[in-house]
Amino acid sequence: MEAACLVRRLGLPQGEEALKARLRRPGHPRLREALAAYLKRLQAPEEVFRALERLEVGAVVTGQQAGLLGGPALTFYKAHTALCLADRAGAAGVFWVASQDHDVEEVRHLHLLRDEVPETLSLDLPPLPSGRIPLAPHRERLRAFLGPWAKDYRLGYALEAETLSEFFARVLLAFLGERGLVPFDPMAEELAPLFLEALERELSDPLGSAEAINREAERIRALGGKPPLRRKPGATNLFLETDQRRLLFYEGGAFTDGVRRYTAKELWEIARADPSRLTPAAGLRPVFQDLVLPTAGFVVGPNELRYVAELSGVYARYGLAMPALFLRAFGVVVEPPVRRILEKYRLDPWAFVDEGEAAFLRAAEAWLAPFRAFRDRVEGLLQEASRLVEEAEALEPNLVRPLRRFRARVRGEAERLRRKLLAAQAARDEVLARHLRRLKVHLLPFGLPQERVYPYAMYALRHGEALRRLAEAPWEGRVALYLG
């Protein structure tokens, strides 16, 4: 079942009216103070500090793993949707930096397209949350890979970060700070203490949220959906970080991470000493987010929408109204060489993203049709010359020899013409192949949609108007951004 359809069938809040109904909800009483301290340390632009004032109205929140150079372009599309909705409601646009995520495979690669060749930097990262991974050991490799772009003042600022998640937050500030985007890193020393009350409550009933998820999963399954978050017996929604981040299980009045056992008191003492060591799993993270932030709207991708749909019971358990849910905008950047190819074949960029080579060949068929029709007419002339010889044999034998000479001349000329046609076809086929390769490299790199591979910061570094075009784009649906 499509995620958006599932959300409608579950009756979950969607749309701007639902967002407006959730404004003026209070966040954590120390939120603005903590965020101001965090942003001051990151030397955020003035527009971001002004956006903090709009937290009194509410927040439209989105988030993503802390990928290199801001991660794939979908990060900026999420931020764009959140900022547009926030502006329309008079609220603040907040970006949750998923610094607690320890799936480093999601964040260790950086793909750039330069001189029509995709280039990849892959960092060897430890299996730790990105908020724990220092940037210093990787800074020079990043600079070398970025080349002349590393001298751009925005990247110079971002590369001063101490951790991978801070690098990500600084990229957001460098490129989207002027629009007032507020990054929020839950592992930042200024912000992690805001979650202590939520952690204490979860430790007091460690299986309650997991049971709520499983009940909702059964409801979704009854509707024909496939819930992604079903919890195993004894699994909590909390991770403990020791030498690595491990899921906690609860049984017989005690917790275990598979290495040792803990009492609730011991875990609480760990959290009080360093609240960033005890972090929520996916089934609890949005709720923890909304216990601290005055979230009125939540911008997600299609896969996120599926798991958020399972969380209504967890929200109810914490006495929270679920925020209004919005799908992010989907984007594809079209640079001048690609635009010329698309226009030549009258091909929509989204058709190529959806269908790839099949869409291109279908569009190219019309371009090849006149060429093929001409070749067929030449073949028809040869066949007509042969038929004339056959008719002459029956009609007048004296016509046979001259018609055979005529046929031979036609055949010779046709053969020469055929060779020229084949050469022209080969050249045209090479043009087609070259155009197809270029479209794939730009729009479907590695067989994936462009927005899931190349960072939008790459386009902003290459085209001065890229950020303006994004700011002017629709906040929802499919958007083609023509640059250059």
Curated annotation (Swiss-Prot):
InterPro entries: Bacillithiol_biosynth_BshC, CC_BshC, Rossmann-like_BshC. It comes from the Bacteria. It holds the Pfam family CC_BshC. One of its GO terms (molecular function) is ligase activity. The keyword Chloroplast does not apply. Residues 372-435 form a coiled coil. Keywords: Coiled coil, Ligase. It is an enzyme of class 6 (ligase). Its EC number is 6.-.-.-. Belongs to the BshC family. HAMAP family: BshC. This is Putative cysteine ligase BshC. The lineage of its organism: Bacteria, Thermotogati, Deinococcota, Deinococci, Thermales. The gene is bshC.
